[in-house]
């Protein structure tokens, strides 16, 4: 269970809990693949590192333009 940062604090960084989950998971996979972490924390767990990076605003996302059916 995540205690810090709280889910409420993390939700201020994204538009939905699904986006948060996808963002953290993708970043954690990048860390496992060898990307350098952007925060200096004591944890070696990729999900914890990715969560902290999102919380600090170091990892962001961009929604693609929506194309409707014409």
UniProtKB/Swiss-Prot annotation:
Give the record's GO CC terms: DNA-directed RNA polymerase complex
Q: What is its EC number?
A: 2.7.7.6
- Lineage, top-rank taxon, reads Bacteria
Gene Ontology molecular-function annotations: DNA binding; DNA-directed RNA polymerase activity
* A single GO BP: DNA-templated transcription
The record's keywords, sorted A to Z, are: DNA-directed RNA polymerase, Nucleotidyltransferase, Transcription, Transferase
Instruction: Write down the Pfam families for this protein, in alphabetical order.
Output: RNA_pol_Rpb6
Q: Which reaction does it catalyse?
A: RNA(n) + a ribonucleoside 5'-triphosphate = RNA(n+1) + diphosphate
**InterPro entries on file:** DNA-dir_RNA_pol_omega (IPR003716), Pol_omega/Rpo6/RPB6 (IPR006110), RPB6/omega-like_sf (IPR036161)
Q: What class of enzyme is it?
A: transferase
Function of the molecule: Promotes RNA polymerase assembly. Latches the N- and C-terminal regions of the beta' subunit thereby facilitating its interaction with the beta and alpha subunits.
Tell me, how does this one assemble?
The RNAP catalytic core consists of 2 alpha, 1 beta, 1 beta' and 1 omega subunit. When a sigma factor is associated with the core the holoenzyme is formed, which can initiate transcription.
Family under the similarity heading? Belongs to the RNA polymerase subunit omega family.
Supply the HAMAP family for this chain: RNApol_bact_RpoZ (MF_00366)
Q: What is this protein called?
A: DNA-directed RNA polymerase subunit omega
Q: Which organism is it from?
A: Caldanaerobacter subterraneus subsp. tengcongensis (strain DSM 15242 / JCM 11007 / NBRC 100824 / MB4) (Thermoanaerobacter tengcongensis)
